[in-house]
């Protein structure tokens, strides 16, 4: 939530397990991280949590994902929602049918029965992203019963900060980066011999790139380079399996609530 002064604090206030984010009580969760930190993966994990609740009998909340890299010039958040809704549910019927279905979606939004997962504040390709961000702020204010989970990059969030500063119930979270010790443990779990793990550790320390290992994407590339494809296979993009599970077992740094 906003700081008592009305501003987001830059100081860390504690930690939170990623799986607990859905129960954090924030109406808006801003999930920030460096490139390759797993922001989209966290979002997908949250969507699955909502889906599990749905399958277990809680049919009140429908998760809907919106990719901001698909927003085109001049579009507002309402336009992005309509596009995502049509694509997500395969609505290819007549325009009248689309309007009727979307009117029902708007009713669900007004009732707070849709949770929106908005991915990529940093991926807006429009010439004036601040206009879209303003429309997003208005959208959040309009549908004040809905929950929003939004991802973006830490350093680029400053440009959006003002738009979220005045919104009540907004939590800001940073993805914590994984430590070298945790990565070495992961390599042991993969079955690498201790001598290769020690060699990997020494190469990292000598090169002074320990901090670069902190995100899944960087780790995949560095491990493949130093260990070789015979010992470490780069997981498929978008399906990094056990590697991302290790990062998901890390935590979120609570920046402001």
Which residues fall in each region the model found?
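P-loop NTPase signaling cores
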Residues: 2-256
């Amino acid at each position: 939530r906003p700081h008592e002064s009305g501003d987001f604090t830059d100081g860390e206030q504690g930690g939170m397990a990623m799986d607990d984010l859905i129960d954090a009580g924030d109406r808006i969760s801003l999930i920030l991280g460096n490139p390759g930190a797993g922001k989209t993966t966290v979002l997908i994990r949250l969507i699955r949590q909502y889906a599990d609740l749905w399958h277990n009998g809680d049919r009140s909340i429908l998760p809907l994902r919106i990719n901001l890299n698909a927003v085109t010039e001049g579009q507002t958040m309402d336009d992005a929602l309509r596009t995502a809704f049509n694509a997500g549910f395969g609505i290819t019927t007549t325009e009248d049918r689309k309007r009727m279905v979307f009117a029902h979606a708007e009713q669900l939004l007004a009732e707070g029965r849709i949770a929106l997962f908005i991915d990529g504040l940093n991926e807006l390709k429009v010439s004036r992203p601040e206009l879209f961000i303003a429309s997003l702020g208005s959208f959040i204010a309009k549908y004040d019963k809905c929950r929003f989970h939004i991802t973006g990059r830490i350093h680029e969030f400053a440009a959006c900060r003002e738009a979220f500063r005045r919104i009540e119930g907004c939590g800001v979270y940073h993805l914590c980066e994984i430590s070298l010790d945790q990565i070495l443990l992961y390599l042991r779990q993969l079955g690498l011999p201790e001598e290769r793990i020690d060699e990997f550790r020494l190469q990292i320390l000598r090169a002074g790139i320990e901090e670069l290992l902190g995100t899944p994407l960087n780790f995949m590339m560095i491990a493949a380079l130093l260990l070789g494809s015979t010992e470490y296979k780069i997981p498929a993009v978008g399906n990094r399996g056990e590697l991302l599970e290790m990062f998901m077992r890390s935590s979120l740094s609570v920046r402001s609530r």
